[in-house]
Amino acid sequence: MEFSIHICEYNRSNTDCETIYRPEGSGDYLFLLFKKPMKVYDGTAFIIAQENACLFYTLDHEQHYQAVQKLRNSYVHFWCGENLGEKYGIPQNTVFYPQNTEAIDELIRLQQREYIVKDPYAVEYEEALVRQMMIMASRGMRRRSRPDCTRNFRSCALRC
């Protein structure tokens, strides 16, 4: 199977103003959900990513971000034989703001549980959860780009 979670943490808090800097990337895919504002280096300068921003880093892309004050996020480092960001239309190596961050965060919580407990079929379930998270983020971006859609699923499905 061409899938594995390397590390997954839900609602992780680190020290104030902590900086993460991986000039060569981490060698795996990284999906981040920022719970607090973060400074993110975009290749030329730091930008401020607001609360509930997401970031999907590809395999060898530089990862450079710093907490504005307190670092709090949920994240998943994973390996997959295909680029799920590309497959599902997720912005790569740049900050984005899906509408449904609570649901995305819940999927990361479930992934962390599965990663720790290792119940039967854990790898298959972890892959399903990561794919669901990526699809949910993609759909959350589409809703954001369609302002006439409301959060009500039925009315959105009928109009969009």
Where would I find each of the regions flagged by the language model?
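An amphipathic alpha-helical interaction segment
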Residues: 76, 80, 101-160
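Short acidic-hydrophobic, aromatic-tinged amphipathic segments that line or gate anion-handling sites
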Residues: 95-99
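N-terminal regulatory/effector-sensing and dimerization cores
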Residues: 2-94
